[in-house]
């Protein structure tokens, strides 16, 4: 993922509301969200090249989400795949805090990442560009390719739009897909400097990214209500012909 917006214990009907965009090279082969064949309790997409995933949930109530930390000057060519951090947690028997504490020791071997792990009742956050494992507080949060709640333009706008969507008693998944499909560029004066150059900073600044070779490949919406009923929807975009397809799942945890 490259943008994760979420509301945690901040709505009278929902424990957790997630709206996220996955940005990736168009040529990278990806399998849309599905219940995995061998690990049939896990619902997630799959990166066909490295075998990991970027976001997933299990019928046992475990949830994990990943973004990369943008630091182009410190890319390690031989680093292990970050996508396995998500799938390993979903498969592991440890609770989120224990899993992330164990990851602290090996975190530096990976290229930059942010990882949220938890259950539907408690979330923790760890990234290898910050110290320690942190329990996430209630409220609205945003995570892109910097630390949690870093006020990049897309994060600030996304959080504000999500907060507005939370005013509804019943949240429509389509309203969350609509806020994710925002391709307006940030003002140049508001752009971060992450070392990729001004032109690329501008290209990467919208909530929904479009370019000739890289962009927002899919959007995911997850709603978990107070009775632990999960709605999981993923919309995949075909940039070649401007079409999209949506898969939807509902289950109890």
Residue ranges and their predicted role:
Residues 1-253:
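N-terminal nucleophile
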């Amino acid at each position: 993922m490259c943008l994760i917006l979420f509301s945690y214990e901040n709505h009278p009907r929902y424990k957790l509301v997630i709206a996220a965009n996955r940005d990736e090279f168009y040529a990278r082969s990806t399998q849309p969200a599905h219940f995995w064949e061998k690990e049939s309790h896990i619902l997630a997409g799959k990166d066909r090249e490295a075998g990991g995933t970027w976001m997933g949930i299990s019928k046992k109530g475990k949830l994990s989400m990943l973004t990369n930390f943008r630091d182009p000057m410190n890319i390690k060519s031989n680093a292990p795949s970050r996508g396995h951090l998500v799938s390993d947690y979903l498969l592991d028997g440890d609770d989120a805090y224990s899993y992330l504490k164990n990851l602290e020791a090996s975190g530096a071997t990976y290229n930059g990442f942010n990882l949220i792990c938890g259950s539907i009742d408690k979330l923790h956050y760890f990234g290898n560009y910050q110290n320690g494992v942190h329990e996430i507080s209630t409220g609205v949060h945003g995570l892109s390719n910097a630390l949690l709640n870093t006020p990049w333009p897309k994060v600030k706008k996304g959080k504000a739009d999500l907060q507005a969507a939370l005013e509804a008693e019943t949240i429509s998944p389509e309203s969350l897909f609509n806020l994710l499909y925002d391709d307006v560029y940030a003002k140049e004066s508001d752009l971060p400097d992450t070392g990729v150059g001004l032109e690329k900073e501008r290209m990467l600044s919208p909530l929904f990214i479009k370019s000739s070779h890289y962009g927002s490949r899919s959007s995911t919406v997850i709603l978990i209500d107070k009775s632990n009923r999960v709605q999981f929807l993923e919309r995949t975009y075909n940039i070649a012909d401007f079409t999209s397809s949506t898969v939807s799942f509902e289950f109890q945890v």
